[in-house]
Every structure is written in C-alpha cells, then in structure tokens.
C-alpha cells in the first residue's frame, strides 16, 4: 500500500512522546482529579494506557464507535459498546475521554453527546473535529492521513537515489 501524498506516519517513539505531552497538558486540567478515563476504542486504547499511567488514573472504561470500516474512508457510525451507566451520571463531569485522533468530529460528537460535561482529549486533531475536543497535542490538515504505529509493519524501503538515478 503506498502512502497518500499527505501522509503523517507516526512511530511508536513519537506516539509515546505525544501521549506523554498530552498527559502533561491534562495534569493541570480539572485540578488533576479525574474519576475515570473513557477511551474510544480502538484508537483510544494506547493513549489511554499511557495517560492513565502518567496521571495515576485507575478506572478505565471503553466506548466503541466504529467508523473506519475499510481503513481508507469513514463509513456509517455505529455504537458497538456503550459506556457504563455509573460514569454517565452527572453528564460525565470529572471524566476524561481519550482518543488517538479527531478527524471529522463525527465520532467525537456521538461520545460528546453521551457525556457533555466530560473533558475530551486527543493526541491529534484535524480542523473539522477540533471544535469538539478540549485538549490535543498536534493539529494536522484535514487532507492528511495519519498512519499509527499499530497499523503499520516494517517493510523494505528503496533508497531515495534509486528514484533519482540520472
């Protein structure tokens, strides 16, 4: 599979640094008193683990909203797993929602409607989804495809000189 013209491949090291940077930003929010993390699966699982460790949060819940069905474009949104009712009390006040990325904002909108008082944080944000997120680390253009490390494998890369031989 070739990368699109605007590709943003993220290594494990880079993602870990970015998730820790998000943790640092979140450490000052809500006076550091989070009741729980609700991570949006599957993309929110990895950053949620890092953030939970960094902020000392023990309660981690998931909500599953499927949108990328073929890894190339967003399909119809479907909630596959709901949030535990106890965390929905008080509209999610004191709860931290974590995802890897907000793209169009459709997934974020569904989860935000479930927990309007929760604090929504993503590692990466695109312009259409950015208004739904309270905290993020890096903004990328809407037409950039982010390749996360858990979606990639190691493959041989031709030397640049091979394409520029005179």
Curated annotation (Swiss-Prot):
Annotated metabolic or biological route of this protein: Purine metabolism; GMP biosynthesis via salvage pathway; GMP from guanine: step 1/1; Purine metabolism; XMP biosynthesis via salvage pathway; XMP from xanthine: step 1/1
Residues that coordinate or bind xanthine: 103, 146
Keywords: Cell inner membrane, Cell membrane, Glycosyltransferase, Magnesium, Membrane, Metal-binding, Purine salvage, Transferase
One biological process term in Gene Ontology: GMP salvage
Binding positions (5-phospho-alpha-D-ribose 1-diphosphate): 42-43, 99-107
Catalytic activity: GMP + diphosphate = guanine + 5-phospho-alpha-D-ribose 1-diphosphate; XMP + diphosphate = xanthine + 5-phospho-alpha-D-ribose 1-diphosphate; IMP + diphosphate = hypoxanthine + 5-phospho-alpha-D-ribose 1-diphosphate
Protein's cellular compartments: Cell inner membrane
Membrane topology classification: Peripheral membrane protein
Domain of life of the organism encoding this protein: Bacteria
Cofactor (UniProt): Mg(2+)
One of the record's GO molecular function terms: xanthine phosphoribosyltransferase activity
Signal peptide: none
Presence of keyword Membrane: yes
Enzyme Commission number, as recorded: 2.4.2.-, 2.4.2.22
One of the record's GO cellular component terms: plasma membrane
UniProt key word Phosphoprotein: no
Residues holding guanine: 103, 146
Annotated binding of GMP, by residue: 103-107, 145-146
PANTHER family to which the protein is assigned, alphabetical: XANTHINE PHOSPHORIBOSYLTRANSFERASE, XANTHINE-GUANINE PHOSPHORIBOSYLTRANSFERASE
Family classification: Belongs to the purine/pyrimidine phosphoribosyltransferase family. XGPT subfamily.
NCBIfam families, per the entry: PRK09177.1 (NF006613)
UniProt function note: Purine salvage pathway enzyme that catalyzes the transfer of the ribosyl-5-phosphate group from 5-phospho-alpha-D-ribose 1-diphosphate (PRPP) to the N9 position of the 6-oxopurines guanine and xanthine to form the corresponding ribonucleotides GMP (guanosine 5'-monophosphate) and XMP (xanthosine 5'-monophosphate), with the release of PPi. To a lesser extent, also acts on hypoxanthine.
Quaternary structure and partners: Homotetramer.
Name this protein carries in UniProt: Xanthine-guanine phosphoribosyltransferase
Species per Swiss-Prot/TrEMBL record: Mesorhizobium japonicum (strain LMG 29417 / CECT 9101 / MAFF 303099) (Mesorhizobium loti (strain MAFF 303099))
Gene: gpt
């Amino acid at each position: 599979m070739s990368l699109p013209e605007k590709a943003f491949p993220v290594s494990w090291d880079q993602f870990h640094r970015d998730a820790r940077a998000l943790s640092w930003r979140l450490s000052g929010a809500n006076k550091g008193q989070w009741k729980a993390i609700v991570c949006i699966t599957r993309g929110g699982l990895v950053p949620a683990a890092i953030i939970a460790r960094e902020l000392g949060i023990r309660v981690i819940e998931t909500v599953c909203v499927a949108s990328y069905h073929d890894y190339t474009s967003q399909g119809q949104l479907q909630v596959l797993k709901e949030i535990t009712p106890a965390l929905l009390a008080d509209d999610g006040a004191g709860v931290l929602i974590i995802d890897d990325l907000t793209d169009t904002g459709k997934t974020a909108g569904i989860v935000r409607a479930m927990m309007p008082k929760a604090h929504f944080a993503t590692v990466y944000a695109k312009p259409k989804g950015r208004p739904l997120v309270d905290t993020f680390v890096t903004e990328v253009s809407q037409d950039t495809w982010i390749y996360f490390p858990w979606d990639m494998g190691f493959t041989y890369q031709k030397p640049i000189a091979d394409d520029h031989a005179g």
